[in-house]
UniProtKB/Swiss-Prot annotation:
Gene3D superfamilies: Glycosidases. Catalyzes the hydrolysis of aryl-phospho-beta-D-glucosides such as 4-methylumbelliferyl-phospho-beta-D-glucopyranoside (MUG-P), phosphoarbutin and phosphosalicin. Plays a major role in the utilization of arbutin or salicin as the sole carbon source. BglA and BglH are the major proteins contributing to hydrolysis of MUG-P by extracts of late-exponential-phase or stationary-phase B.subtilis cells. Pfam families: Glyco_hydro_1. Induction: Highly up-regulated by aryl-beta-D-glucosides such as salicin or 4-methylumbelliferyl-beta-D-glucopyranoside (MUG). Its EC number is 3.2.1.86. The keyword Hydrolase applies. GO terms for biological process: carbohydrate catabolic process. GO terms for cellular component: cytosol. This is Aryl-phospho-beta-D-glucosidase BglH. The lineage of its organism: Bacteria, Bacillati, Bacillota, Bacilli, Bacillales. InterPro entries: Glyco_hydro_1 (IPR001360), Glyco_hydro_1_AS (IPR018120), Glyco_hydro_1_N_CS (IPR033132), Glycoside_hydrolase_SF (IPR017853). Belongs to the glycosyl hydrolase 1 family. It comes from Bacillus subtilis (strain 168). It catalyses: 6-phospho-beta-D-glucosyl-(1->4)-D-glucose + H2O = D-glucose 6-phosphate + D-glucose.
Amino acid sequence: MSSNEKRFPEGFLWGGAVAANQVEGAYNEGGKGLSTADVSPNGIMSPFDESMTSLNLYHNGIDFYHRYKEDIALFAEMGFKAFRTSIAWTRIFPNGDEEEPNEEGLRFYDDLFDELLKHHIEPVVTISHYEMPLGLVKNYGGWKNRKVIEFYERYAKTVFKRYQHKVKYWMTFNEINVVLHAPFTGGGLVFEEGENKLNAMYQAAHHQFVASALAVKAGHDIIPDSKIGCMIAATTTYPMTSKPEDVFAAMENERKTLFFSDVQARGAYPGYMKRYLAENNIEIEMAEGDEELLKEHTVDYIGFSYYMSMAASTDPEELAKSGGNLLGGVKNPYLKSSEWGWQIDPKGLRITLNTLYDRYQKPLFIVENGLGAVDKVEEDGTIQDDYRINYLRDHLIEAREAIADGVELIGYTSWGPIDLVSASTAEMKKRYGFIYVDRDNEGNGTFNRIKKKSFNWYQQVIATNGESL
């Protein structure tokens, strides 16, 4: 197949992706309540701090709440076809359990989506993205409590009804599998002494699966032409050697993630997970009708983030020297790493796309991919981020190869098209954007926006539908 025959499909959703809690700021404006992000000053992998006495960059983000028109104009200049963001749950239901929504919060997203549509940019909306109401954590125990399903369903129905003529593409939970890696952020979980943590995490996941299925049902009822997806933090795992034990370990590691898309895309708990739960004394409490609900209301597409691949080993020496990758695994000696230790593997994206499509035969959407790096503003005011261009180009070329393989890929929204507060480290120094934001790790700066070299590069990629790659 010649390179001319390898192309992105017409109508491909090019764009960028953010999360409300990482960009909006205005954490206590507009009737908004406190979320888990508001008490996580050091990022999703660190202990939460309810005292709120230390610096938390999420509180002001990049001031997108007040500057979204300026930012959307820049996205439009790049030619975005789509922009993925989340609705801050606590702007709509400040404590999470209110009967009636907060009108001021609803109005903000009306204005935001109107601005996107004015510029012919399709909103892609995540209903819950690492910003669960703190009230649901403190008063109900987070997603451990089945009662939270009811609150989530009310919230989902509220936003579906409000934005039914503005938003077609939805996702129910961001990186739903992260509940196993960052349980407070992913599930609002605070463990008691002696509690079976694994049981609590998988019980929370089950409640999220049920909530997701109810959201799919409601979304299809309220917005008949809507497309409602799941979203996982995806990766591919290589065996460190051809030793059968390493190959099996790699398969098991991938299944820990694929379980979450299996349930939402296929509509049932797979056999391998039933065995895992039984062997680890994990008892999932299911209500009558749960299994039927999961079966009947599967997602329309699979959204996923991809930043890195992983390697698996059963060698104690390899395990002892592992580290760096956010989701674990051992170091792959054939790959380079980012400044934060995330191993860079464009070919792994093609493998991931093929794995997911072989498994589900549902449309796929890369909703996060990017390079977190330190950017330097030169004396002439420019930012020469060739490293970012190279990273993104290499990954997009592999995505194009996957399309040629037969994968149905509907879009690509790079992570953080404008610099934002990192989820994993809660800092500004780790930058992803095509647009630089003048703010540092201490919270100082003008918040001014500056186009990086990658801005014009991505603009050209979109204008040519990827042919300039």
